[in-house]
Amino acid sequence: MRINQIFNVEAARSKSTEDYGMGNVPFVTNTEINNGVVKYVEPLEKDKVFCGPAICISGLGYATVHLGKFLPKGNGGDSCTVLTPLREMSNYEILYYAALFNVSHGWRFTFGRKSNTTRIKNLELSPVFSESPLDMTSEIDNNNSIITTLLLKKEEELKK
């Protein structure tokens, strides 16, 4: 199934990293480190702030998942492209499609050939989540349980 049959495909609209003061909104760029976030900014009036769940694809073709508000880099040839679901999706499903994009299409984009809405919208994402042979749900639930237990234990230690 084509990406534009699963997601609304939009170009980011913002300025360069240096144009922003410190704030509370994650600024997402081309880095693969820290889920693409390079700093937290105060958006400018003409910026397009997105609200997740959404997938942000960097100009270099790396997909990251964002569940809350975020500001993707949107100027020049290395702008981000944002995929917002056309229908309600679980976080597992969003994560699945981001990983599928990275495995299937990440190789297509480089410094010489940046990603953009035109290049992304007609790419295929197959198999779709409902036909996937993977069951990430139980693994993610197990990991969440382990982390929750560790966090609660640490919280109790800090109370002492």
Label the model's feature ranges.
Residues 1-7, 28, 80, 94-103:
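Short, structured motif recognition centered on aromatic/hydrophobic residues
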Residues 1-13, 17-35, 130-160:
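Non-catalytic DNA-recognition/assembly elements of restriction-modification systems
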Residues 17, 110-111:
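A short, aromatic/hydrophobic, helix- or strand-capping loop or linear motif
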Residues 107:
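Extended, Lys/Arg-rich, non-catalytic nucleic-acid recognition/anchoring regions
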Residues 73-81, 111-135:
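A short glycine-rich beta-alpha junction/loop motif
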Residues 23-28, 53-55, 79-81, 121:
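Structural beta-strand/beta-sheet cores of well-ordered domains, especially the beta-sheet scaffolds
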Residues 40-99:
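A short beta-sheet element
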